[in-house]
């Protein structure tokens, strides 16, 4: 074993500090004022070759490959004072103290709050199996969130978690570990200081986290990280807010890609349709027609791999980049028909090739595969339908060949979206199988997680190389840190059960906390018997808030999960999906916010209400953006839904029932009566929620003609509505529309609209729904001119411009033609003594 007991002098070298211990050299970088890198070089190999990082201050052998995604920065300013017993490195916001004997590293913020402390003796170790271990001090009231895609409760305190992604079909949503993703990042939230700090362990090797599950009398309470290979390479990310940690983590690993609008619509799917013996193309077109007949909006179809199940010497086998022409007679015509219907198709592509694949010999000649650990031949593993070999994406020439296969096999027919599936490389039992690793050489065991990221990068590049103005849309089941740069992901092949409905929420929230805003689960469950009627309705009612909303199944009872599968329930299904579409201006704006800031769309309660410790274990209720609290029903047969409304610490901030507009103070649990139609939601003070006033059935083709905005102006607030064409890259050249809304609350409430960008404002009508329970306005003005007042709702609805106070909703309804320029609405709630006049 190798253990760091004590350290000697600390020196500065170019852009890092070197700490020489009695076991290994440790290097420390102030990457930014808030991000510190601590790397213990057990192998003495300081070569940089990261696929994860989008921000660096050093050269890396992946710089050329990631040149469109990586930002080079200068290290932040810091000063070193080296003493006999302790060295202190001070930056502008963080202070590092290096205690020399016994050795440990501590990090403090500018207020003197301890953010991180190593455990002496245990901090930087290599065990007898060559695994590297880092151990950190924790407290009994610390909470831990993130870790990528994990099941169970959202708070992982006292949990042990493995990070070895695999094909976990039908997983137990409470207990199964690992799932499909490898994102070794978590957020520690202190229950005493309410401050957050992020830990990103920069590794692609299999690893595990012990978050205080074990205790030892000789040391302070601790957590530990253990990796099968590579250095201890920790990026410590200061907050103090959770949002700041996530924003800085996504500075480090990349912001979410801005997806086309279709990616946020209902994505139809099923293993059933592409597996029909013939005419699958017609069956899928009929499915789209049926959704329209049923009045259900739809934007996409996730095409399972049956389309490429072709005849081989061993029978029908799935072979990526081929087409079964009995099932899909003319792929080009079919893609064109789907596009005419406003449907984006995402064909399934896999990185493994069966030994009977018709292109196998061509791929072998191009030397595209992972090599056996001993033999000079591609490494073999179990695959769909037989033995397969696996593509090595860490080789530049392989990447170029792969893009050509994508173009020739899919994109030339009209494909603009790719579903990268089964890319965990789970069936490669030989973890010592060799990969190229940009010429450095490594093993598949150390680099499995990056393959999915690279696949998604390549599918995006192939689409834009074929047509530079198409906005790519990649879907992926697996993923490593940084997958958010490329793809929308989902929680794999979940089990159809009530627990999956409930615990998949925490899984999605955890992914958002891990920088992956575009996540979801298979609504209705993927594997198992078909969902019972109540479960299916509740799942859709919850699913419409997920960034990715897809109903997908491979039911074991030979059924197909579809919106109309229960005639007595389809009205509730339709209503829920239409709610999502009506809120698409809000959802797309949150998507844009994630693209710019890294912040999640679905936010856990404790992220928005970080000072209320009563929210710290909440993994079912969540905030959609900052304005809307969603408390879906996830228990079978529920008639009452208990909802905790957080303590905001501000008496002016309250919550309003979305439907009744009943008002509630924070810091209390309320009981909400529910039935099968219920989707409990609460509007938070300061809310600005843009919605479509007209019906939308397809996000790619239907415009928002009337913009309806819900507001709760108890406090000052702001929000940016974002819009563009939703399908091209023209937004990069200024063809977008930002509507910055700012609200100044008070007796005179001012609502200012400021516009930026050249994209056409499609909304012809503006309608404001301004909650104000106390009283109706004295008057309303638009740019200084009084707006007509109506006492009768019918007359208000018939007018082009006017205002009306709804006694039912206790809100001011203001309607006017959209000026399509900067303007201001003034609503006066001033005291007016009519009798005194």
Predicted stretch roles:
Residues 578-597, 658-738:
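Catalytic cores of secreted or luminal carbohydrate-active enzymes
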Residues 1-256, 261, 267-271, 278-284, ...:
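N-terminal accessory segment at the very beginning of proteins
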Residues 1, 113-677:
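Catalytic-domain carbohydrate-binding cleft regions of carbohydrate-active enzymes
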Residues 366-367, 373-374, 684, 808-812:
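Short alpha-helix boundary/capping motifs
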Residues 49-63, 323, 622, 675, ...:
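Aromatic-residue hotspot detector
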